[in-house]
Swiss-Prot record:
GO terms for cellular component: cytosol. PANTHER family: THYMIDYLATE KINASE, UMP-CMP KINASE 2, MITOCHONDRIAL. It is an enzyme of class 2 (transferase). The gene is tmk. This is Thymidylate kinase. It holds the Pfam family Thymidylate_kin. Phosphorylation of dTMP to form dTDP in both de novo and salvage pathways of dTTP synthesis. The lineage of its organism: Bacteria, Pseudomonadati, Pseudomonadota, Gammaproteobacteria, Enterobacterales. One of its GO terms (biological process) is dUDP biosynthetic process. ATP binds at residues 11-18. Belongs to the thymidylate kinase family. Coiled coil: none annotated. It comes from Buchnera aphidicola subsp. Acyrthosiphon pisum (strain APS). NCBIfam families: DTMP_kinase. One of its GO terms (molecular function) is ATP binding. Gene3D superfamilies: P-loop containing nucleotide triphosphate hydrolases.
Amino acid sequence: MIKSKFIVIEGLEGAGKTNACICIKNLLKKNSIKNVLLVRQPGSTPIAEDIRRLIKKKFNDDNLIKETELLLMYAARIQLVEKKIKPALKNGIWVISDRHDLSSLAYQGGGLGIPKKIIYQLQSLFLNNFIPDLTIYLDVSPEIGLARALKRNPLDLIESRSLFFFKKTRRCYLEKSKLDKKTIIINANLNIKKVTQNITKKMLNWLNKQVI
């Protein structure tokens, strides 16, 4: 049996991360990997879910400054990693996470302009460089992604940011993803059926390379 793995799905709003998480979970089950935990960041613990609501809430006169947003993201992330992700992996459970540390580099680093060295310092200090075994980055143009997001629900605080913000965020995502050998880039501008097919193909190829 393959040792439990930590798989992360990344991408802008409307990229199809939820669909990808479900697709991968079902694919793992078809390949006899039945113990799978789905989580989301920020969230998936009581404390982290409260932080999520705070981050996404629109305040009349006191929205979060970018540094506060970054630190809250890390507070939620650390809580989830220590309370759920690490224990699950230790017990042989595979973990699929909707977002992880790359989101902070892209959103707070690329989009909001916080120096990336600060984010790397937080990663090193609090996560001890805890990184995924595989990241799947769903690359979608901001125009297409936000149009999809608008069809779901009213936009939250982060989703309501400017197109320029999301273009900077996407640029950072692509820059980091192309440099990471553990990251697979999927064209998420395509329809959901084609994206699912491409994810399945890439995942099966990756699974076949894992050491038992």
